[in-house]
């Protein structure tokens, strides 16, 4: 069973990280091509392209300038411990055991606009380049065109290594679009998290993101190997609703205490 998640805009390159074996990201040749494109952008260009403040644009212009193809523990950190958004709050990588992280290395992948696909212990340098960014490049008008079939093929290889042909899609639509689902040989399960607010169950973005991370944590800590085991997920107060679920879309509901 393989789970895929989105990256996060919020990064942590300051706090201490446990001592794990680390690896070079697989697609640095591709990353380098994107960096070359990004280095031609002014702070004003970047601010407009990414809809970010001048301050953030300046920070990321500096990041692109400093980025190097050689990743080491001085300029990088393992992806699992670098991302700090809502999904990663739920995942809470810092509290995972060494055995958990080793399991995650085989069963979890992170999609990335710059790196394509990352394993948890792959090194990464600080960056901001969301998959939906309309960054014109030698291969087309955006990052979906740039990555083409590369990410899909890498995901398939990771699925093949599992031996059960199951993919758990915990990524956002923006990132999952980089995976060409119709080209995958896999049973794809999409968990959906609904919260009851004002008497109606619906997706609430903040809660849903955190729940995706909780599901990753559950999968990792319980060493899940069977689709049916996913239905037992109960972290954060969620419960599996069989009546609302289908064979490929697993619906989990929760009641928010006002």
From Swiss-Prot:
Q: Which residues form a coiled coil?
A: none
User: What is one cellular component GO term in this UniProt entry?
Assistant: cytosol
Can you tell me which family this protein belongs to? Answer: Belongs to the UPF0246 family.
Lineage: superkingdom: Bacteria
Q: Could you tell me which Pfam families the record lists for this protein?
A: H2O2_YaaD (PF03883)
Which residues are the signal sequence here?
Answer: none
Q: Which InterPro entries does its entry note?
A: YaaA
| Protein name (database record) | UPF0246 protein NTHI1156
Name a biological process GO annotation.
response to hydroperoxide
